[in-house]
Amino acid sequence: MTFEEITNKILVKDKDYEMPFSKGLLTRSLTAAGMKPSESYILAREIERDLTDQGLRKISKDELRRRVYYALINRDYEDIAEKYLLWRRVLKKHSIIILVGGASGVGTSTIAFELASRLGIPSVIGTDSIREVMRRSISKDLVPMLYESSYTAWKALRHSSAEEYDTKEMHLLGFERHVEPVLIGIESIIDRSLTEGMSVILEGTHIVPGLLGEKYHSMQNVIILNLTLSSEEIHKQRFVARAKVSDRPLERYLSNFEIIKEINEYIVKKSRENKVPVIENVSISETVQKCLEIVTDRFVDLNEESEADSEIY
């Protein structure tokens, strides 16, 4: 028996693979394009029913997208249809690199995974993971700041006197020295993704405009976003919530909160100096929507740069 006979699923075919049709994936794509979640699910369910009624067991990804596009047009969702079409065109022709930066606790990982889900980008990499890899290749004696957290790296700095030690300037210098070797790994992933034509989202506190290589700021398909939290109360609540679902020590964050706040202000300052969007991440849904608007604007520019395509997809 074939896979589709065993699973009783409609298979969606791409060039290199086949996967079962998913209402959930289609719903997320439609929601990302601006459709209400409930309406997105209804349309996804209707499309699945139409395919089943027609007795289709396999459908190409291009044909499925074509059907979704015209289903939106027929329901007077022209703007959503064009946005849905735009994203598919751009993601098919270009590798897209999205960098989501921000201090500890502002929610970069949550937003990164939400964006990946909405845009259909399969890879999300946290910069903490890159830091761990860099630790294996750079000795502690050479760069001791790398072996500290972003907010305790200053303790590994050499200092001439105690008076010069525990200051904002030293906190930020330690943070910069902590970030610099991690950026080597981040930039390597960006370069390789661009070379291999793969889309990826990187997230974490090590993504700092101004420290990141200047060439990436001018690349159309590298999109840099910065998240922040101006409210100390909300920021601290995020650490409390994180501690409930992970083994990260709450007291360590709270006891270093003033330094984390300094780092947050520093990253925001560097972002504004380098014309990187700064987004208040109070509401996850609103933040995701703002990020998608920024990404869509960049997609429009990329699409205009591409050669005219006679096909819909």
Swiss-Prot record:
Q: What's the top EC group for this one?
A: transferase
Q: Which cofactor does it need?
A: a divalent metal cation
Gene3D superfamilies to which the protein is assigned, alphabetical = P-loop containing nucleotide triphosphate hydrolases (3.40.50.300)
Q: Which reaction does it catalyse?
A: (2R)-2-phosphoglycerate + ATP = (2R)-2,3-bisphosphoglycerate + ADP + H(+)
Q: Name one GO molecular function term.
A: kinase activity
Determine if Transit peptide is one of this entry's keywords. no
Q: Which pathway does this chain act in?
A: Thermoadapter biosynthesis; cyclic 2,3-diphosphoglycerate biosynthesis; cyclic 2,3-diphosphoglycerate from 2-phospho-D-glycerate: step 1/2
HAMAP family recorded for this chain? 2PGK
Question: This protein is called what?
Answer: 2-phosphoglycerate kinase
Q: Which organism is it from?
A: Methanococcus vannielii (strain ATCC 35089 / DSM 1224 / JCM 13029 / OCM 148 / SB)
